[in-house]
Structures are given as structure tokens and as C-alpha cells.
């Protein structure tokens, strides 16, 4: 079995920044509170809660409230500043830029965002600008529009959505902006190419992670593909595949990927009788 690990793996800079900041606050002995997953990764959240991070939508007792990487609505942010002595905004810079862009364009045209309506990033965005969030093309009366995208969406799927919207409607002015995170686009392209030479693709990441799900869908077009959160989920028959490729979402730590590779080698060793 040949194991090929993608070059673009591990945390993106926004996730790394968020986790590092929370760990530093906890190491200082501060009572740190948040209202959901800092990042969409179960193992990372378990580690942070063990260190003392409190997660609750109702919690008001704490010294520091940390805003998740996905962001929160503007009015909610202002409320939190009145409740907590310190609020640390860990919204990813690329996500923050999306919010500002939507807010700016909403003054002059209808904002249409390609994304999952219930995703935390999209919930937060609607707190900055009145926007239609959907992945399904539809008819619209407005003639002036701007197209934006959730930062973790597939670029190709986004382009297809915009093309369908333009075919279905008679817009006088339609602005198309690529607001997808370049880190996720690079991973998307690597998975698109590398999965073509794989007998099995393994995508490692949280089951609630949009960007991980995107990589899973792309790899599935070209090879047998599985989506796992931990090495324990590797199937026993993984050793039957000749070339196994390992990919990861942007909320997946390098340590977890290393553990998956280690487990694969152990399974191969047991099959060959070398362990």
C-alpha cells in the first residue's frame, strides 16, 4: 500500500490563530467562554474544553468571551461587550472581509450569497446585511444584484450557481465577487487532481465542517472515498487498496493526520506480518 499525503493539510491561518489565542487565554488562568464550536473539529474542541473552555449559548459568567472563527451577528457582538469584561473577536479575517463586502453592497443592490443558510458564518453575515442565502437558483424581481459566497464553498459550484441565476433572471446589473477563501480553493484543486491517481481517498475532518465536506464530494468523483474524524474509523479493508491518499479540512490538526497515517502503516504491517 502506497500512502500519499496531500501538501495542503492541517489548520488554515484563521483556525490556527483562533485556537492559539484561546489556549493563551486559558494558560493565563482566565475564565474563557464561547457560545459554540470555535472550529468544526471534535478533537480540538475536546482538548480546549479539558483545558477549561466553557461552551454554552446561555452562559454569561466568565472573564473573556471569544467570538468563533465563523463570526457572530453584529448586534450580538455589541450585547456581549456589555456583558463580559473582555470580548476577543476571533472571526477569520477572510470571513470579516465578506461581512464588510456584503454590508457595503447592500446599500445599492440585492445581496445574494451562495451558502448554507444555517451555517454559523451565514447566520452571522445576515446580522451585517440583509442577504438571501441559498444554494438553489431562483427567480428574483430585483434588477441590481451582487453575488457573494460563503468562504468555504466550492468555487466551481458557486460559478454554476451564478450562471444558473443569470440564465433564469433578467438582471440590469450583476456583480460577481469571489469571496471564497484561497486556502480552501487550493485544497480543492489539489484534491481534484490527486484523487485521480488514488484507489482510496481518505478525507480527515469534522463531520460539521463545510470545507471538509466539499473535499469529500470532490474526491468522490474520482476514487473510492471515506470521510473520517479519527483513526479509529478506518475500515479493516483499507489495506486492500494500492494507493491511498490522505486529505484534510482546514480545522483538522496535523497531529490527527499523523495519527491516521501511523494507523494506516500499522494496519499494513499487521497484514504483511511485520508487526
UniProtKB/Swiss-Prot annotation:
Keywords: 4Fe-4S, Iron, Iron-sulfur, Isoprene biosynthesis, Metal-binding, Oxidoreductase. Gene3D superfamilies: 3.40.50.11270, 4-hydroxy-3-methylbut-2-enyl diphosphate reductase, catalytic domain. InterPro entries: LytB/IspH (IPR003451). Its cofactor is [4Fe-4S] cluster. Binds 1 [4Fe-4S] cluster per subunit. Its EC number is 1.17.7.4. Disulfide bonds: none annotated. The active site is at 121 (proton donor). [4Fe-4S] cluster binds at residues 12, 92, 181. One of its GO terms (cellular component) is cytosol. Pathway: Isoprenoid biosynthesis; dimethylallyl diphosphate biosynthesis; dimethylallyl diphosphate from (2E)-4-hydroxy-3-methylbutenyl diphosphate: step 1/1; Isoprenoid biosynthesis; isopentenyl diphosphate biosynthesis via DXP pathway; isopentenyl diphosphate from 1-deoxy-D-xylulose 5-phosphate: step 6/6. The keyword Iron applies. It comes from the Bacteria. The keyword Transcription regulation does not apply. PANTHER family: 4-HYDROXY-3-METHYLBUT-2-ENYL DIPHOSPHATE REDUCTASE (PTHR30426:SF0). This is 4-hydroxy-3-methylbut-2-enyl diphosphate reductase.
Amino acid at each position: 500500500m502506497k500512502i500519499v499525503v496531500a501538501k495542503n493539510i492541517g489548520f488554515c491561518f484563521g483556525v490556527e490563530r483562533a485556537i492559539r489565542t484561546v489556549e493563551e487565554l486559558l494558560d493565563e488562568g482566565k475564565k474563557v467562554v464561547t457560545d459554540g464550536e470555535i472550529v468544526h473539529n471534535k478533537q480540538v474542541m475536546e482538548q480546549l474544553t479539558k483545558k477549561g473552555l466553557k461552551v454554552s449559548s446561555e452562559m454569561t459568567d466568565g472573564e473573556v468571551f471569544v467570538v468563533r472563527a465563523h463570526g457572530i451577528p453584529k448586534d450580538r457582538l455589541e450585547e456581549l461587550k456589555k456583558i463580559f469584561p473582555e470580548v476577543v473577536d476571533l472571526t477569520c479575517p477572510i470571513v470579516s472581509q465578506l461581512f464588510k463586502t456584503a454590508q457595503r453592497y447592500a446599500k445599492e443592490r440585492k445581496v445574494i450569497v451562495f451558502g448554507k443558510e444555517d451555517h454559523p458564518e451565514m447566520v452571522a453575515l445576515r446580522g451585517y446585511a440583509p442577504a438571501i442565502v441559498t444554494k438553489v437558483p431562483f427567480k428574483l424581481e430585483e434588477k441590481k444584484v451582487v453575488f457573494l459566497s460563503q468562504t468555504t464553498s466550492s468555487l466551481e459550484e458557486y460559478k454554476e450557481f451564478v450562471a444558473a441565476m443569470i440564465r433564469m433572471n433578467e438582471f440590469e446589473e450583476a456583480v460577481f465577487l469571489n469571496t471564497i477563501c484561497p486556502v480552501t480553493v487550493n485544497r480543492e484543486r489539489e484534491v481534484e487532481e490527486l484523487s485521480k491517481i488514488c484507489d482510496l481517498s481518505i478525507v480527515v475532518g469534522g463531520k460539521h465542517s463545510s470545507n471538509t465536506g466539499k473535499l469529500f464530494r470532490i474526491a468522490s468523483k474520482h476514487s473510492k472515498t471515506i470521510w473520517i474524524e479519527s483513526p479509529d474509523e478506518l475500515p479493516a479493508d483499507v489495506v486492500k487498496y494500492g494507493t491511498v491518499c490522505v486529505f484534510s479540512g482546514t480545522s483538522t490538526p496535523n497531529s490527527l493526520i499523523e495519527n491516521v497515517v501511523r494507523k494506516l502503516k500499522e494496519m499494513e504491517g499487521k497484514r504483511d506480518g511485520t508487526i
